Amino acid sequence: MNNTDELLAGALAGDLGPRPADLVATSVFWLHHGTRLAGGNTTYLNQYVLVRQGGSFGACAFEPGEVDAAICRDASGASLDTLLREAPRPLRIAALDAYLSAVSPHREAAGAEPVTLPAGTPETRALARDAAIAGLLDIEAGAKVGLIGVVNPLVAAIRKRGGDPLLCDFNLRTTQWGDPVTDDMHEVLDTADAVVATGMTLSNGSFDTVLARCREREVPLVVYAQTGSAVARAFLGAGVTALSAEPFPFSQFSADATTLYRYRAVAAA
């Protein structure tokens, strides 16, 4: 599998599981929320569109203005085939994520390592989540770690692992510690010894660029995904070295213990 277009085509053809034309998106909904963690100076604003199909959910973040709330009315009850072919990209990714999650739920997937995030405050849960993500990095002290999609606790977790973060985000210009953040991901992809990328890159199509560049340079790629966690999983061992998959409901929407799933690509013999 080379890119998300090939994955989408495989799903539509029924090569990956049931025919999407036979499956229905029971519920399509969206979430818009803000978060400012204690001690931070950044308010994170996120929008997600979500698809419920059978026993699974699929999710994709989107930028303001990309998806209108009316889509919840118009798309609920549609076939997955229709959404995968005709919907705006964020909804297509959410539908594909729901489809792949139904075919192979994270809780049942071979190779998935469940990690329990403890009950507690947003800060406690964010620190635990980002430590779990950074724990997927296999790096030497001082390694340059490209981070595409910047959240302050993850920057701190990478540093704790001994990495030197190279930061890229489309909406953030500095961290709470004053680290510069570029909006040009090629500055990061061309120099990093390892890359950590958010699943949100699936929303705007930049995931394929990140994937291809990491393959070309033969550098490890760790994906942390609420957006498209099952979509990113499809590239495990094909450019993605490791994955932290967090299916809906996400950790920020609960104060109780929740589970994310870590995957590592199996090395070739």
Label each PLM-derived region with a short phrase:
Residues G162-T175:
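NAD(P)-binding Rossmann-fold cofactor-contacting core
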Residues A157-I158, S206-R213, A234:
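A short acidic, amphipathic alpha-helical/loop segment
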Residues M1-N152, T258:
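Electropositive, gly/pro-rich neighborhoods at or near active sites that engage anionic ligands
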Residues D179-T191:
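Short acidic low-complexity segments
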Residues G146, A194-T198, V222:
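Structural motif
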Residues L189-D190, A212-E218:
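Short, conserved loop/helix-junction motifs that constitute active-site signature segments
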Residues G162-G163, E216-P220:
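A short helix->loop->beta-strand "cap" motif at the edges of active sites that frequently abuts
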Residues P220-A269:
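C-terminal functional extensions of proteins
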